[in-house]
Amino acid sequence: MTPRTTKSAHQAGPYTYEDFCAMVREDQKADLINGVIYVASPENTDANELFGWLFVVISLFAEARELGQVYGSRAALRLDGKNGPEPDIAFVLKAHLHRVHRSHIDGPCDLAVEIVSPDSVGRDYESKRRLYQEAGVAEYWIVDEIEEKVTLLRLDDKGKYREVRPRKGELHSTVLPGFWIRPEWLWQNPRPKKTQVLAEILGRLG
């Protein structure tokens, strides 16, 4: 198991969103949070495979149901002049695709997924939770490969995140109606085939 740590390369600033865009390369994973730029460490192969598996499953489901568009970890959310997080996975509903521009998403996505790495623990569980809640990201999934758990947070009618508990070992999304996963799938080696998982999920929808 990889040791947990909260250390991360960062540039304290304060920087604006425009500074962030000018300073960070397009191929570099980074976040702007409260004027501070956090540069992600290179991914290990396990995290990369986990990201790829989940990204494909969500993308195929969203496409099959014609719900919206899924974006990877280089899509920044321009929330305001000092905040531009880049979720590992961002889903935008069809009704909100006008927010999507070539270089960024203007405002919140509807669902954000963060895959926890040793240097992002504090940001994913604390800073980004607050930021996504305040911005109005309807669902926030924290996928913690280190602890082998998935935390699903959903905005309530007061705009506060509430944790959604599994039902019969499954986590169900409301932003993606009909979508669910078994967290255990993410930790299996090998993981179940993506096409088989999609067929099982879609099979319940008739």
Name what the model sees in each region.
Residues 1-206:
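Gly/Pro/Ser/Thr-rich low-complexity, intrinsically disordered segments predominantly at protein N-termini
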